[in-house]
Regions:
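N-terminal signal peptide c-region/cleavage motif recognized by signal peptidases
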Residues: 20-22
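Catalytic nucleophile loop of clan PA
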Residues: 312-338
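Cytochrome P450 catalytic-core helices
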Residues: 180, 184
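Conserved catalytic-core segment of clan PA serine endopeptidases
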Residues: 138-154, 160-166, 171, 190, ...
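Bacterial N-terminal signal peptides that target proteins for export
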Residues: 1-9
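Chymotrypsin/trypsin-fold serine protease catalytic domain
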Residues: 241-316, 346-355, 360
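Short beta->alpha transition motifs characteristic of CBS
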Residues: 185-188, 335-344
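Protease-domain processing segments flanking chymotrypsin-fold serine proteases, especially trypsin-like
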Residues: 25-176
């Protein structure tokens, strides 16, 4: 595979010779395969196939359009505030916790050092063998997931949202990371163009076709949605100014993950070469079908706040989790969220220590 040649933000590439097994809290971050029971009888949402248009990923046209990390402590801490909207339209605003505040300041003042490591993670065995590393503009190496009822695919879903301004619906991809917690991209929840939240978020896990009957577990409505405050406050008229804060959380009204399972997530300080796995709902494929892709991520293309890769994506893939299969932990661990594309690569926001702490504060 030809390594990406994009210049990254001048920052440390933290890696070591050994890949550490993640240390999880009692609940947040750890994976669960679920109990295998169907959720369809408990469905709460009204899914209408065909009404949503895939949300296009933001474009990164050149490095000049990517803002450098904030270096001011107060501004950096403020960017990790929680901004949200409840299903009944109430605004939510929560200041960063003291633990998160201390972590942000610690990372902001950390010295820049590190070495390049060797291969760390393998391709997910359930995705099968496949040639990795093809460019999105080259040969399409994505494969359809035919059985979406089995874990981990039961934990991955189609996410709809409505524009209050136009009344139209858009779609993204999203992943269960807890009983009621869904991880996606912030631009799937909030529109800078409209300067407003989207609404009526609907999560359809394991969707596998173009009819309502193809939603094997039903569809589920949201209780609240959240983004990093920096995604809203730091917008300067172009996407690159908020790339680093393009993370979103949807809290569902019902416990879906106990039955269907959820993926683990973690920060690896020593993140180096690994195989990225993406599963989602690209809009260039038959409506409502789930597709998977795998590709290599090289240490030279990993920054503390994001990383880049060649995995094939398309509008609708925004919000897909980028996960690695950890052989030691025997778990699928989310390391980032697919958020943007450029002529040379696709980009994920990295789940670094601060982002993991932010997600943990919303875990349900």
């Amino acid at each position: 595979m030809t390594k990406l040649t994009n210049a990254l933000i001048a920052s440390a590439l933290l890696s070591t010779a050994m890949w550490a097994v993640p240390v999880f809290a009692a609940d947040p971050g750890s994976a669960s395969a679920g109990n295998g029971e169907s959720m369809r009888d408990a469905t709460s949402g009204d899914y209408k196939p065909g009404r949503a248009k895939p949300i296009a990923p933001p474009q990164l046209t050149d490095e000049d359009n990517r803002a450098a990390p904030i270096t001011d402590e107060a501004a950096a801490v403020k960017s990790y505030g929680i901004v949200g909207r409840s299903a009944d339209g109430k605004e939510i605003k929560i200041e960063p916790s003291e633990a998160l505040r201390d972590l942000i300041i610690k990372e902001l003042n950390a010295p820049a050092n590190g070495t390049e490591g060797g291969p760390r993670k393998t391709e997910d065995p359930d995705l099968g063998e496949g040639e990795a590393g093809r460019q999105v503009f080259g040969t399409d190496d994505r494969e359809q997931v035919k059985n979406t009822k089995t874990y981990p695919f039961s934990a991955i879903g189609y996410l709809e949202a409505k524009s209050p301004k136009t009344g139209s619906f858009g779609s993204c991809s999203a992943t269960l990371i807890g009983p009621r917690t869904v991880l996606t991209a912030a631009h799937c929840l909030y529109s800078h163009e409209d300067k407003d939240w989207l609404s009526d978020y609907l999560f359809v896990p394991g969707l596998n076709g173009s009819t309502a009957d193809d939603a094997p577990f039903g569809a589920f409505t949201f209780e609240s949605a959240y983004v990093l405050q920096g995604f809203i406050d730091n917008y300067q008229g172009y996407y690159g100014s908020v790339l680093l804060w393009d993370l979103g959380i949807v809290t569902l009204k019902q416990d879906v993950g106990t039955n269907l399972g959820w993926l683990g997530y973690a920060n690896y300080d020593d993140l180096g070469d690994f195989i990225a796995n993406l599963v989602g709902y690209p809009g260039d494929k038959p409506m409502g079908t789930m597709w998977k892709a795998s590709c290599e991520v090289h240490a030279e293309n990993i920054a503390p706040e994001y990383f880049q890769y060649d995995c094939d994506t398309f509008p609708g893939s925004s919000g897909s989790s980028v996960y690695a299969y950890d052989n030691k932990a025997k778990q699928r661990i989310i390391t980032g969220v697919n958020v943007a594309e450029s002529p040379d690569a696709n980009t994920a926001v990295r789940l670094n220590a601060a982002n993991v702490q932010w997600i943990n504060s919303l875990y349900k």
